[in-house]
């Protein structure tokens, strides 16, 4: 299976002056934990890291002794553009691809393998987790307008897996129609293509704020105790 890791993050919400993926977490950069899990996943054979040139050297330094191919791909100005460039950088033989946010550094090898095996059946999928909070829909004035049925709500995460040709077609449609999406599954929704959810468990958080870093540190400490 081919894996693209989106690594063109910023440190704005962290209050940092550099890519949040290079901030320290339990003695290593955040993205080092993401790469460690991906490299340990049995079903991942090739990894493409999509990022900005300024981060190329420090990120590639983390995988100098990798046990499988790791390729750098220059990212774009948005996540959507970066994924499109990542797709262009895949090996010609790639038929299926997993796309993962570098900031989801608590993803374990087993999650990558589960997603890879599920994708091998042909169905597009996303890692996700059932919503446990009561969600409110509000208007522009902050007034509640609706309470969606929680049993139907899942928080979308990554990895997300797709057939390469179909995902390329989806991005071509997005460019032609001026669509802006925050994840690739949204393209499939707009085009009426089915996407399955795969329960990722509670720990697959995205490190975005200083609080998230503290949570990730605690989770990693617990794992080391086990």
From Swiss-Prot:
The record marks 150, 206 as: Positions MEP for the nucleophilic attack. It is an enzyme of class 2 (transferase). It comes from the Bacteria. The record marks 13, 20 as: Transition state stabilizer. GO terms for biological process: isopentenyl diphosphate biosynthetic process, methylerythritol 4-phosphate pathway. Pfam families: IspD. Disulfide bonds: none annotated. The keyword Repressor does not apply. The keyword Transferase applies. Pathway: Isoprenoid biosynthesis; isopentenyl diphosphate biosynthesis via DXP pathway; isopentenyl diphosphate from 1-deoxy-D-xylulose 5-phosphate: step 2/6. Keywords: Isoprene biosynthesis, Nucleotidyltransferase, Transferase. Belongs to the IspD/TarI cytidylyltransferase family. IspD subfamily. This is 2-C-methyl-D-erythritol 4-phosphate cytidylyltransferase. It comes from Parasynechococcus marenigrum (strain WH8102). The lineage of its organism: Bacteria, Bacillati, Cyanobacteriota, Cyanophyceae, Synechococcales.
